[in-house]
Regions:
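Long, contiguous domain-sized segments
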Residues: 1-241, 248-256, 260-269, 274-275, ...
């Protein structure tokens, strides 16, 4: 057995956003909303604006993906402003925006525009170094697609075909290599009409522009395609004499990556992710000096036969390869690879009629075989009978060659780390590795429906939707929060479509729905904290996690104190910087109330309770020109003042900023979300948990020692499964308690699974990465001020100003 590091095709890119913003201008082109509000798919192919960006505006590169186009220009281009102004007048159906430095430095803007790990930005920069307008013959770029010419061949008709290596950045920051070819058309037969430049035998990719073919360029390679649009070509000059024609794909690719790394060095650092590879077989004559390697071995079966087989298997490995430490583990170390031992058996489920049928929707068992070893395979290797186990021969060394030949293809699978990745189309789960959990940013939209009277027909009721949008970027562990409803103006096409999809789902399924926008999949992840730590639990699904923005949740510790001078200085500075007269008057009135209370009590440090009481005693500032409405009722007058409206939000954000995150009031729309979270109502709303499903005994069999979450499936007309607390998470409730790694280990050991009744459940992974964030949020929730019972009906929706 030998180990070495091999370079994968996964890219790790570290960007210098300030340098990019300093030297480049990035242009964003998006289609405008249609006047009739229709949600038809918009295509850029009907308009040559992408070609104009390259031909007329001289963009270094442009990339098109998911309904938007981006182009990159050198900052020193003085004519760019005039060209963009002309484009805006000519192409009125597009939004043409220049990304400023603040947008480029914002992680949320980058996530929305460039995707996970800024994939599109990497593709844009890579494409910019091989602009096909130059005389460089080595690399060519069309709309972000990178082609490395390798060889020119002639077909039977005498036409040349240029074989190219196509480089693209795929999801997950993997560099994908494929081979495609372009065919030359006889220049004498070039029609006056427009041309498509396409891959041979394929129409998958748009590669065009609007220029005519210069007659002097006899070696241009392109394919003719009847089209009413105008497109360009790639000038592949005659490269048949190049010595690099017969180079390998990898060599050609690495040549390009080395060049790109040098030219982009001031703006980003590109590196390949390396992984360890273990080769099982004869020992090397001169094995490299390696550090001790460790592996997790998890017995998912936990039967007497599996214990016996595991012991024999591990003894064999220890005898043959003493330099490696492979031991059974009760706690999986997420830093090292894991090998699973599981059953190779069939699984069953209930159909709609309640009959027990084989579940053929679990092809992930085949995937397990690529990541682990079945008990049946080990029994066959060691000649153990599955019905009546017997010990193999004592002399294991005599069977070394036979075992080596059998184990080599099995243990070679250790080169891959265990990951859980859900195949969305097949609805399947594979093996889980904590490090890979939540590796991509996602946008989560939680709808909440409200029944209203139909104004057109008072006898009927209609459903109205409120939405809470959360955007999380695991790379920065930052969360954005936004509230809107179906009547909100300025919704994007994607959000408008999401509203319609949500309505359709409610009409069809009668259940709550979470929509993960960037994958168009159902997202079923809910966090359910109870009234005390022992009652807290999570229902979570692969690659999903619902966590409110804890910086915007009401986290105020009312006993927290701030020096009076520091607070008053902050008030005066905020008043001086603001240009809003009402906001300034609100701040002045609030500061006067605080100063009066300070003088009355003779304090040097002011508590948040005092600051909050002072605000409740101030009167709202109203413009003299404001229309006077109906007089407030006595009940309304008796309610304590809250931070409502736009001004209230500014005041709340101001005091939260001054007190380092201690917000006094709940911002707009979040109180309902808070209520649902604390009362665990989200689970009660029949969240749709996906297949695969398992029975209790099968859950016992699949328990892997890490701790997982299982949630009850939704009810149907025949089977009704009550809401069940499947797992509980023990978290600290003491304030300011530091969560250490030792405490994490304690939590893992305390994870217990409770089976309420025999039924089928959905197996879900435990969110290791965000346990710390959940603990912080849970502790913050303990400090929330509980309103009096007679104030529970108080309206919490802020008035728009």
């Amino acid at each position: 057995m030998s180990t070495f590091l091999y370079r994968t095709n996964k890219i790790e890119a570290i960007f210098d956003y300030a340098a990019i913003a300093r030297d480049f201008t990035i242009l964003l082109v998006e289609p405008k909303e249609t006047d009739d509000g229709s949600d038809k798919d918009f295509s850029f192919y009907q308009n040559p604006i992408l070609d104009v960006l390259i031909q007329d505006a001289h963009a270094l590169a442009s990339v098109y993906m998911q309904g938007r186009c981006m182009a990159i220009f050198p900052k020193a281009d003085s004519k760019l402003s005039a060209v963009l102004a002309k484009f805006s007048r000519r192409y009125t159906e597009y939004h043409i925006k220049v990304l400023d430095e603040a947008s480029l430095l914002s992680p949320f803007v980058r996530h929305r525009l460039f995707g996970y790990a800024n994939r599109l930005l990497l593709q844009l920069l890579l494409a910019s170094v091989c602009n096909y307008q130059t005389q460089e013959l080595q690399y060519h770029n069309v709309l972000g697609q990178i082609y490395l010419p390798m060889e020119i061949k002639e077909d039977k008709a005498g036409y040349k075909n240029c074989v190219c290596l196509h480089v693209s950045v795929t999801a997950g920051m993997y560099l994908s290599l494929s081979v495609t070819s372009f065919r030359q058309i006889d220049p004498a037969n070039i029609p006056k009409g427009p041309l498509y430049l396409i891959e041979k035998d394929s129409m998958r990719r748009y590669l065009g522009s609007r220029s005519r073919i210069p007659k002097e360029e006899q070696a241009i390679l392109f394919c003719q395609k009847s089209s009413r649009f105008t497109h360009n070509t790639i000038p592949f000059l005659d490269i048949s004499s190049r010595a690099a024609l017969h180079e390998t794909k990898v060599g050609r690719f690495m040549e390009f990556m080395d060049m790109a790394s040098r030219r982009l060095a001031p703006y980003l650092t590109i590196s390949f992710v390396e992984q360890p590879f273990i080769r099982i077989g004869d020992k090397m004559k001169n094995p490299p000096v390696l550090e001790p390697a460790s592996w997790n071995f998890v017995d998912l079966i936990q039967s007497p036969l599996s214990v016996l087989t595991s012991k024999l298997f591990l003894e064999y490995l220890q005898n043959q390869y003493p330099e490696y430490k492979i031991t059974p583990c009760s706690e999986v170390n997420p830093e090292v690879p894991t090998l699973l031992l599981f059953h190779n058996r069939r699984y069953y489920r209930h159909d709609k009629q309640g009959k027990l049928v084989e579940d053929v929707s679990l092809p992930y068992r085949a995937n397990l075989r690529t990541q682990g070893i079945t008990l049946e395979a080990l029994c066959d290797i060691f000649r153990l009978k599955t019905k009546k186990p017997t010990m193999p021969d004592k002399d294991l060394r005599k069977k070394q060659k036979m075992w080596d030949g059998t184990l080599r293809p099995l243990l070679a699978k250790l080169q891959s780390e265990l990951r859980i990745k859900e195949d969305i189309q097949n609805r399947r789960f594979t093996v889980f590795h904590p490090q890979d959990y939540l590796s991509e940013p996602w946008t989560y939209v939680l709808p909440q429906k409200e029944t209203r009277q139909d104004s057109a027909n008072p006898k009927k009721k209609k459903t109205f939707f409120h939405f809470y949008e959360l955007i999380m970027d695991p790379n920065t562990e930052a969360i954005a929060f936004r509230y809107f409803n179906e009547a909100s103006e300025g919704l994007s096409r994607l959000e408008a479509k999401m509203v319609e999809d949500t309505k359709a789902f409610y009409d069809y399924g009668k259940h709550g729905l979470g929509i993960r926008l960037n994958y168009n999949e159902t997202l079923d992840g809910f966090i359910c904290p109870g009234k005390d730590p022992a009652m807290s639990y999570m229902i979570i699904r692969t690659n999903s996690f619902l966590l409110p923005d804890y910086t915007d949740m009401p986290m105020a510790d009312l006993k927290y104190e701030i020096p009076a001078k520091e607070l008053f200085d902050a008030f005066e500075q905020e008043i001086a910087q603001s240009s809003d007269a009402i906001y300034q008057a609100e701040l002045s009135g609030w500061m006067e109330q605080i100063a009066a209370k300070q003088m009355e009590q003779g304090l040097t440090d002011l508590s948040l309770q005092l600051i909050k009481d002072a605000f409740k005693q101030t009167k709202a500032v109203v413009l003299p020109s404001a229309k006077t409405g109906a007089e407030a009722t006595p009940e309304e007058k008796s309610k304590p003042r809250r931070m409502n409206g736009t001004i209230g939000t500014q005041l709340n954000q101001f005091i939260g900023r001054v007190t380092n995150g201690h917000y006094l009031f709940t911002p707009k729309g979040e109180k309902d979300l808070q209520k649902y979270l604390m009362d665990a109502h989200l689970l009660g709303h029949a969240c749709r948990l996906s297949r695969p499903v398992f029975y209790k005994e099968q859950l016992e069999e699949m328990r892997d020692g890490i701790g997982y979450v299982a949630g009850s499936n939704t009810s149907n007309s025949r089977y009704t499964i009550p809401r069940a607390m499947i797992i509980r998470v023990i978290l600290p409730s003491e304030r300011n308690q530091v969560i250490s790694d030792e405490m994490f280990k304690t939590y893992f050991s305390q994870l217990t699974v409770h089976y309420v009744k025999t039924g089928y459940y959905t197996v879900l992974p435990f969110p290791f990465k965000y346990l710390r964030e959940y603990a912080r949020y849970y502790n913050a929730c303990q400090n929330i001020e509980v309103e009096a019972e007679d104030e529970e009906d108080e309206e919490n929706v802020m008035d728009d100003e």
